[in-house]
Amino acid sequence: MSVWAIGDLQGCYDITQRLLEKINFDPAQDTLWFCGDLVNRGGQSLETLRLVHSLRAHSVVVLGNHDLSLLAIGARSEEEQRKVNPDLLRIVLAKDRDALLDWLRMQKLAHVDRALGWMMIHAGLAPKWTTQMAEKHAREVEQQLQGGGYRKLLRNMYGDQPGWSPGLIGYDRSRAIINLFTRMRYCTPRGRIATDDKGTPGTQAQGLYPWFEVPGRVERDLKIVCGHWSALGLTITQGVHAIDTGAVWGGKLTALQLDTDELRVVQVPGREVTGPAPVARAPRRPRERLGRQRSRGNRGNAGNTAVPAKPPVDTPQD
């Protein structure tokens, strides 16, 4: 039996199939861990979602920002749904859409296997979160997402603010937790996410750190595997194994074997693309950037009273 973690698929069905063939995946005895962002941008999102759904008895999935965006689209009116890009439109118009979206909504924000010694998330963790705290906060949002009020959560999850604080309540709290698990790249030592910085370490504004290198962060008792940050490439440091290697942008799709002491990585070439991947923005002056974030954050700590950002039609917050 082998346990494999796989990076962001993003609707790259053919590439996913090639990777499964290369690792000799046997559903009778192997298990797959998918790091989120199953859909969007790759052109084969419906096929990819159906594939992972068909493997549900032999796999674990954590939700990424693109997956949550798809769920939000699925909860909107038919008129709004028809405005999305063709890749996602095929899902919301599919005959099996309800089965696919209902299953997707039941997936986790964090998966932990203490016997194996691993935690899987999509993006990142707050600097002061232990793995136990992360599990607890993930379960909070999962219960909302899996409950009868999930549509209201999906309408209120958009927005960069507030930053995480243990005292947050209502949808402000849920939004902050979702942003950490699904959008995190850089943050301040206090854990405030910098959503505009998406490039490789060294390009970020002063005072920001990769979430896994923040000074004063807690030591964690599990190894962590994650995706989301394709600009990093394959990165293994500080007990974190980042395996989104940009398959949808012409990079590679990566699998990491988790049930072995040896580092075993298997990759296949990603999608052929005609245009460049998104270019990281030049860093702005830290005083301006962090000052604006603090002022916005101070307005957002009032539980359900904060006005959520208007959700985009089909583009998830990155």
Swiss-Prot record:
Its EC number is 3.6.1.41. Residues 282-297 have a biased composition (Basic residues). It comes from the Bacteria. Keywords: Hydrolase. Transmembrane segments: none annotated. Residues 309-318 have a biased composition (Pro residues). InterPro entries: ApaH (IPR004617), Calcineurin-like_PHP_ApaH (IPR004843), Metallo-depent_PP-like (IPR029052), Ser/Thr-sp_prot-phosphatase (IPR006186). Residues 269-318 are annotated as: Disordered. GO terms for molecular function: bis(5'-nucleosyl)-tetraphosphatase (symmetrical) activity. It catalyses: P(1),P(4)-bis(5'-adenosyl) tetraphosphate + H2O = 2 ADP + 2 H(+). Hydrolyzes diadenosine 5',5'''-P1,P4-tetraphosphate to yield ADP. NCBIfam families: apaH, PRK00166.1. Belongs to the Ap4A hydrolase family. This is Bis(5'-nucleosyl)-tetraphosphatase, symmetrical. The gene is apaH.
